[in-house]
Amino acid sequence: MNMGQLTQSMEREGSSRFVFLSRGLAFLARPSVAVWAAIPLRLIVGYGFMAHGFAKLSRGPEAFAAILHTIGVPAPHLMAWLTILTELTGGLAVLLGAFVPLVSLPMAAVLFVAMLTVHLPYGFSSIKLLSVTSGRAQFGPPGYELDLLYLACLAALVFGGSGPMAIDHYRRKK
């Protein structure tokens, strides 16, 4: 049964709310609307990477290098700077929709390293409720869920395009 048949069936049964909802959602699936889907992905992925890069930079690259050394990453000072630069420049590029397929590769590498060296031992979930004390929730270390979400968003942008209002979009038009 296709969407049209399902809608007609629901109309006959008197489910007007469903019909209104399905027609509203069908509007979102139109190609003229769907092209805009890349913009919220670009905004959250770009901002997220930049926020993490700025956090590492503000605490000092040496502090991040010490963490990398502790978990056994080779050349921790070099890798700290490469990670920070990847997060800042890659995040800005994704935010602007510039060279997204190119910058996604080092960004994905950062995510894979973080997932394998930090988050994997804590399982999938990004939220681990440990306890509630004095009316306050205490959470444990996050799992690899957010790494996978970021990777999925990057893949969607690479395979689906950066969307309108992106530097990549204007470069393709020329």
Task: Tell me what each language-model feature is.
Residues 58-78:
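Membrane-interface interhelical connector segments
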